[in-house]
């Protein structure tokens, strides 16, 4: 799984994030995926017989490891960094990188540190207070093979976390016959 980190982490790190409006993705098949307001994991689960999460890395990082725009979105704070691959029927569909401020990991949200291979979306979107904002998208691939990504800030009990998701080539976002 370290190959995912080597191959796809730079794509997220170097993504040119833009607002969905600036890329005119609304109304497109892939736009429906990128603009999904609820749990991406639940949506992906509907497209396969077996949905799994492979935990690549989880560690605490210092605020100096955050980019300037990440600090702007969640603050100049130390975080728990979580990297996973979401898989459908054994195929890698999404590489995801989550930054959870340590201050978010208090009270009811302390369990976020113990998710392991459980999808983050399954936990976050069961909470009635969950919401998403600051949604940005990027095309990190080529014209011949686009690799779309999205980044958004999630809130749970008014505590932030930042999720960046890269839709890999085999993801249903690119499949015309599996749109829903």
UniProtKB/Swiss-Prot annotation:
Q: Listed GO cellular component terms?
A: cytosol
- Extract the GO molecular function terms from the UniProt entry: chorismate lyase activity
EC category: lyase
Q: Where does substrate bind?
A: 82, 120, 165
UniProt entry keywords in alphabetical sequence: Cytoplasm, Lyase, Pyruvate, Ubiquinone biosynthesis
Q: Pfam families this protein is in?
A: Chor_lyase
Domain of life, source organism: Bacteria
Listed under catalytic activity are: chorismate = 4-hydroxybenzoate + pyruvate
Q: What is its EC number?
A: 4.1.3.40
Q: Which InterPro entries match?
A: Chorismate--pyruvate_lyase (IPR007440), Chorismate_lyase_/UTRA_dom_sf (IPR028978)
Q: Name one GO biological process term.
A: pyruvate biosynthetic process
For the keyword Nucleotidyltransferase, the answer is: no
Question: Where's it found, cell-wise?
Answer: Cytoplasm
Major place of residence: cytoplasm
Pathway field of the UniProt record reads:
Cofactor biosynthesis; ubiquinone biosynthesis
What is the role of the protein in this entry?
Answer: Removes the pyruvyl group from chorismate, with concomitant aromatization of the ring, to provide 4-hydroxybenzoate (4HB) for the ubiquinone pathway.
- Its family? Belongs to the UbiC family.
- Name of the protein in question: Probable chorismate pyruvate-lyase
